[in-house]
């Protein structure tokens, strides 16, 4: 028979102290690993987002004469304002696209009147940061998480609270610190309202503009704002069959490599943000492995286009800190020969199959 009086019911204080020390040490050792695993899991989810977007792009092309999804409203055409039923005729393709973006958001949100009525963002080229709205509208939701890198926590918050303008870039006005993109137009409500419908993924410019001049190009002191180059550009009307090497040409890409410390801008050579190629595959090769960029002001010059990264308020800062003047090769953002060109000579083998 067991002598219950002599049975040990638990740890002694000394043993318990040893267990606590060991558990604490193991937690300290495992914490970075678990953090990396979670980040890598989110990275795979981001690649899955891009794969889904690629499938939707293919379906859009089938339904729209093989067009690459882009704004289709045109200068000189007459359209109806959903907020009041009046008609209007845009004077440029840039303005027409802004009105089309407003129309999409009117229908998606119902915000056609009141304090948070959707305004027309005519002060900006909406193609630059909101080309995805055409495909999002086609997919049925402009606020789907498929447009957000799971590591992009800011964009997730802006999407969840689209009318909390205080949360978004320049919601508190222009930053007091130097080294940010301080164009005053960022702090207007017609721009603030758009962040709730933004995306972590950027569309390459040649998906919505010509491979030749006239076109658009970044202004000298920031990669975020564009100006027309060589005249009045015709926007949109690009087709998938114009892409000469679909497996080697980037279509959309993570603007930041958020799986790395500091979430560096895609143009740093050592980064490997996920990239959706025109054939629907996912490329995770490092940026420096891509071919050099070409000047968007002179596509025939052969000169490599470099530019410093100037952060938007609430965006990741440069690797060298605010004010970093390092010139970065923009690689696949400005592809030599546009849709006819090659970004990665050796295509990435990563292809999602679901």
Feature names for model-found ranges:
Residues 46-47, 51-354:
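Short, well-structured segments within or immediately adjacent to enzyme catalytic domains
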Residues 33-50:
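Aliphatic-rich helix starts adjacent to a transmembrane/signal segment
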């Amino acid at each position: 028979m067991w002598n219950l009086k002599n049975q040990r019911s638990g740890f002694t204080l000394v043993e318990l102290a040893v267990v606590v020390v060991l558990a604490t040490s193991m937690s300290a050792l495992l914490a970075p690993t678990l953090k990396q695993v979670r980040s890598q899991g989110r990275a795979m989810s981001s690649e899955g987002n891009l794969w889904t977007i690629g499938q939707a792009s293919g379906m859009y092309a089938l339904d729209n004469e093989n067009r690459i999804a882009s704004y289709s409203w045109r200068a000189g055409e007459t359209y109806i304002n959903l907020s009041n039923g009046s008609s209007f005729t845009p004077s440029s393709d840039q303005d027409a696209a802004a009105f089309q973006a407003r129309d999409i958001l009117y229908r998606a949100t119902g915000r056609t009147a009141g304090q948070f009525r959707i305004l027309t963002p005519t002060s900006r080229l909406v193609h630059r940061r909101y080309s995805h709205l055409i495909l999002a509208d086609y997919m049925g939701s402009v606020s789907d998480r498929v447009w957000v890198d799971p590591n992009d926590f800011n964009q997730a918050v802006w999407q969840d609270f689209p009318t909390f303008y205080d949360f978004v870039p320049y919601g508190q006005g222009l930053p007091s610190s130097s080294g940010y993109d301080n164009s005053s137009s960022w702090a207007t409500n017609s721009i603030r309202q758009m962040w709730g419908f933004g995306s972590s993924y950027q569309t390459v410019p040649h998906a919505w503009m010509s491979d030749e001049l006239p076109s658009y190009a970044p202004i000298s002191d920031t990669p975020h704002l564009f100006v027309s180059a060589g005249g009045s550009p015709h926007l949109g009307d690009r087709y998938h069959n114009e892409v000469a090497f679909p497996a080697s040409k980037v279509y959309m890409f993570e603007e930041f490599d958020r799986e790395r410390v500091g979430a560096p801008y895609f143009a740093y050579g050592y980064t490997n943000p996920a990239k959706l190629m025109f054939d629907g595959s996912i490329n995770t090769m490092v940026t420096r492995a891509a071919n050099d960029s070409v000047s968007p002001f002179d596509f025939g010059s052969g000169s490599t286009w470099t530019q410093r990264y100037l952060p938007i308020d609430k965006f990741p800062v440069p690797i060298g800190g605010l004010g970093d003047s390092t010139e970065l090769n923009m690689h696949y953002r400005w592809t030599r020969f546009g849709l006819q060109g090659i970004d990665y000579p050796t295509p990435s083998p990563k292809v999602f199959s679901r």
